[in-house]
């Protein structure tokens, strides 16, 4: 306040200059955010349109629906608000109600698509055989249709019928508020009923479902990783016990410590992966929805706790929209999409090498699993097959694979008939785990 008063005393010229500088910085930042959201989600949509093998994967339907909702946020929501932020008023007149409906619809659709993706991944990893039979393109379209229908119902109908607005305390206040909103303001106050009900449907129920599904995914992955480690230790132990010296006497057997370390690292990677997924989503949207439920209970001019000014509230609104720029990185940056992006952008030489070390985890009918590795050539696009992503953004490193090989960790189940195959990309920090289809003889297709 002291700085503001001093600048005002220095003359209006300095105030205008500082205000102009703030507007320029705001315009640059918001433009970068909008462009990054447009670029990321446009690349996802273009990759699926361009490459048939991406369209053949049912789980990619949900990723595309998410990309479309985030793309609509960048086209129908963010630019109009950015212009209003820079101009200092709402210059689009009666378009306000339509914009508010678009805002609620697109943001809700993005969040519900994230929820559907978490449920899809949980079904795929918890009941893989049933998932392969039940999760058809028709079933995927039904889930996507439910998410979008709910988003439309919660947005356009209440907004067009003015159910979302708070009732004015007096007729004079109502006329003044309507006139202000029509001329230069589109920040209409929500009614308490609509603010709470829409927040519950748009955020609190989906985030609760996501917490449950990703927690269960971590527990399943933890059990499988420990089972793998136990089998690897047993295989190494048996191999060491069968080794003999020159005089025919067996060598003393020892349990390898490297297997315990690798098991712990794998569990840590899964935990970090799921923490990134939930952490980014919650950090972006939770502050807004908390304030969205509190502000309707704040009277005009009140200075109660959490009754913040409009500028602070707008900052948290942009935090929520920023989630749309991060979703392509988290959910559509696996090996298949990265290769498609490299092809679309024509940057095989400039982009990071795609000669990735791939570790395959095969799980048989008894729930046992094994790891094996292979390499994919630079610039190659995987053949068309039905794959299902389980956990996005699995974090890995090629050094772990080298350490396992140097430690002599065996692959105990290589000869078994695997039922499922889960691929972890070890060359990058972002990848998706997948399930390969099963042939009639119970083997993976070659």
From Swiss-Prot:
Residues bearing a lipid moiety (S-palmitoyl cysteine)? 347, 351
Residue stretches in coiled coil: none
How is this protein annotated for GO cellular component? ciliary membrane; dendritic spine; endoplasmic reticulum membrane; G protein-coupled receptor complex; non-motile cilium; plasma membrane
GO biological-process terms attached to the record:
adenylate cyclase-activating adrenergic receptor signaling pathway; adenylate cyclase-activating dopamine receptor signaling pathway; G protein-coupled dopamine receptor signaling pathway; G protein-coupled receptor signaling pathway, coupled to cyclic nucleotide second messenger; phospholipase C-activating dopamine receptor signaling pathway; positive regulation of MAPK cascade; positive regulation of release of sequestered calcium ion into cytosol; vasodilation
What glycosylation sites does the entry record? 5, 175
Keywords assigned by UniProt?
A: Cell membrane, Cell projection, Disulfide bond, Endoplasmic reticulum, G-protein coupled receptor, Glycoprotein, Lipoprotein, Membrane, Palmitate, Receptor, Synapse, Transducer, Transmembrane, Transmembrane helix
Q: How does it sit in the membrane?
A: Multi-pass membrane protein
- Please name every pair of cysteines joined by a disulfide bond in this record: 96-186
Residue ranges annotated as Extracellular topological domain = 1-23, 88-96, 164-192, 300-312
Keyword Glycoprotein (UniProt): yes
The UniProt entry, under PROSITE patterns, shows: G_PROTEIN_RECEP_F1_1, G_PROTEIN_RECEP_F1_2
Q: Where are the transmembrane segments?
A: 24-49, 61-87, 97-119, 139-163, 193-218, 273-299, 313-337
Any one GO molecular-function label of the UniProt entry: arrestin family protein binding
| Cytoplasmic compartment residues | 50-60, 120-138, 219-272, 338-446
Into which family does the record put it? Belongs to the G-protein coupled receptor 1 family.
Subunit organization:
Interacts with DNAJC14 via its C-terminus. Interacts with DRD2. Interacts with DORIP1.
Q: What does this protein do?
A: Dopamine receptor whose activity is mediated by G proteins which activate adenylyl cyclase.
Protein name as it appears in the record: D(1A) dopamine receptor
Per the UniProt record, the source organism is Macaca mulatta (Rhesus macaque)
């Amino acid at each position: 306040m002291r700085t503001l008063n001093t600048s005002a005393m220095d003359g209006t010229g300095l105030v205008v200059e500082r205000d102009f500088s703030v507007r320029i910085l705001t315009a640059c930042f918001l433009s970068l955010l909008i462009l990054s959201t447009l670029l990321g989600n446009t690349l996802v949509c273009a990759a699926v349109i361009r490459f048939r093998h991406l369209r053949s994967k049912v789980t990619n339907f949900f990723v595309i629906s998410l990309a479309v909702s985030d793309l609509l946020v960048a086209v129908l929501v963010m630019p109009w608000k950015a212009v209003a932020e820079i101009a200092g008023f709402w210059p689009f007149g009666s378009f306000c109600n339509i914009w508010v409906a678009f805002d609620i619809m697109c943001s809700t659709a993005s969040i519900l698509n994230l929820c559907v993706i978490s449920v899809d991944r949980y079904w795929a990893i918890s009941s893989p055989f049933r998932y392969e039979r039940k999760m058809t393109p028709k079933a995927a379209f039904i889930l996507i249709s439910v998410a979008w229908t709910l988003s439309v119902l919660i947005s356009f109908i209440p907004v067009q019928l003015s159910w979302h607005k708070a009732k004015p305390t007096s007729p004079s206040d109502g006329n003044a508020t309507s006139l202000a909103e029509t001329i230069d303001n589109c920040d209409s106050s929500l009614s308490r009923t609509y603010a709470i009900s829409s927040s519950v449907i748009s955020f609190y129920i989906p985030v609760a479902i996501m917490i449950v599904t990703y927690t269960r995914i971590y527990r399943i992955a933890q059990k499988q990783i420990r089972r793998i480690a136990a089998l690897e230790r047993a295989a190494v132990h048996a191999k060491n016990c069968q080794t003999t010296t020159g005089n025919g006497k067996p060598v003393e057997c020892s349990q390898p410590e490297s297997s315990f370390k690798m098991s712990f690292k794998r569990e840590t990677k899964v935990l970090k992966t799921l923490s990134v997924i939930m952490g980014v989503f919650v950090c972006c949207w939770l502050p807004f929805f908390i304030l969205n439920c509190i502000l309707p209970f704040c009277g005009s001019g009140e200075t109660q706790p959490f009754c913040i000014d409009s500028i602070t509230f707008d900052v948290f609104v942009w935090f929520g929209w920023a989630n749309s720029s991060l979703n392509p990185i988290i959910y559509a940056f696996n090996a298949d999409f990265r290769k498609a992006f490299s092809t679309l952008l024509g940057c095989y030489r400039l982009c990071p090498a795609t000669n990735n070390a791939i570790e395959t985890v095969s799980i048989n009918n008894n729930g046992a699993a094994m790891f094996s590795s292979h390499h994919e050539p630079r610039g190659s696009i995987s053949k068309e097959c039905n794959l299902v992503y389980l956990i996005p953004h699995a974090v890995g490193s090629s050094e772990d694979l080298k350490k396992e090989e140097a430690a002599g960790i065996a692959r105990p189940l290589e000869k078994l008939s695997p039922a499922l195959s889960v691929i972890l990309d070890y060359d990058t920090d972002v990848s998706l785990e997948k399930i390969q289809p099963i042939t009639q003889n119970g083997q993976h297709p070659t």
